[in-house]
Amino acid sequence: MTNLKTSMIDTMTEKIVIGQKHTSELTVTNAVTAIAMGSGDMPVLATPAMMALMENAAMLAIAEALPEGCTSVGGHIESSHLRPSKIGDKISAIAEVTKIDGKKVEFKVAAYSGETLLGEGTHLRFIVDKERFMSKLG
């Protein structure tokens, strides 16, 4: 049974490689400000919005490498928000695979406005079978 389980996990991650990257982008609008998201009272990019963009980049970095019926879910994110961004700024989040351990995939993530680093951190995703994952919700 253990060998079958290991084989299934290996199949889930066999096409994911260290260094695999994706960049996700957004323009700061009122909808993603700290005011709108309830994380602050300033009209600047909300930290949760920056982290969501980083998570999106990580998810998309490996999405096409996953077998049919599988997806990845976020398990942990740690980040520092270093600089503010105003409405109208164009933000890019880059996620790069740094480690693969069974069904766990770790990423280095960073967000930029042009060449300016806005935030950086790490993110962990788990590869799951969609149907099995949803069945656990009861």
What role is predicted for each listed range?
Residues 1-11:
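N-terminal amphipathic/basic-hydrophobic helices that include classical n-h-c signal peptides
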Residues 11-45:
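Catalytic strand-loop segment that frames the active site of acyl-thioester-processing enzymes
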Residues 15-23, 100-107, 113-136:
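C-terminal binding/interaction regions
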Residues 28-30, 83, 127-129:
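Non-catalytic surface loops within mature trypsin-like serine protease
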Residues 46-50:
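A short mixed-secondary-structure module that forms the rim of ligand-binding clefts
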Residues 59-92:
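Hydrophobic beta-strand-centered segment that forms part of the acyl-chain substrate-binding groove
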Residues 79-114:
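Hydrophobic beta-sheet segments that form the core/acyl-binding groove
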